[in-house]
Amino acid sequence: FHVPDDRPCINPGRCPLVPDATCTFVCKAADNDFGYECQHVWTFEGQRVGCYA
């Protein structure tokens, strides 16, 4: 399997707690039918941030 490269999120919505955060679509290898899993990761000034309290 080829794990997709990180890329900007498509239609990420917004990050309520950190409006200026950047969304990246991050994939990593996983034990499932696709061989990988992906998630939206929000970062601001190099730090991962949570978008919801």
From Swiss-Prot:
Example GO molecular function term? Answer: metal ion binding
Disulfide bonds listed in the record = 9-23, 15-51, 27-38
Give the record's GO biological process terms.
Answer: negative regulation of endopeptidase activity
Residues annotated as binding Zn(2+): 53
What does the UniProt keyword field contain?
Disulfide bond, Metal-binding, Metalloenzyme inhibitor, Metalloprotease inhibitor, Protease inhibitor, Zinc
Oligomer and partners: Monomer. Interacts (via C-terminus) with human CPA4.
Role: Metallocarboxypeptidase inhibitor. Has an inhibitory effect on bovine CPA1 and CPB2, human CPA1, CPA2, CPA4, CPB1 and CPB2, and porcine CPB1. Does not inhibit D.melanogaster svr (carboxypeptidase D). Shows no activity against serine proteases subtilisin or bovine trypsin, cysteine protease papain, and aspartyl protease porcine pepsin.
Name used for this protein in its record = Metallocarboxypeptidase inhibitor
Q: Which organism is it from?
A: Nerita versicolor
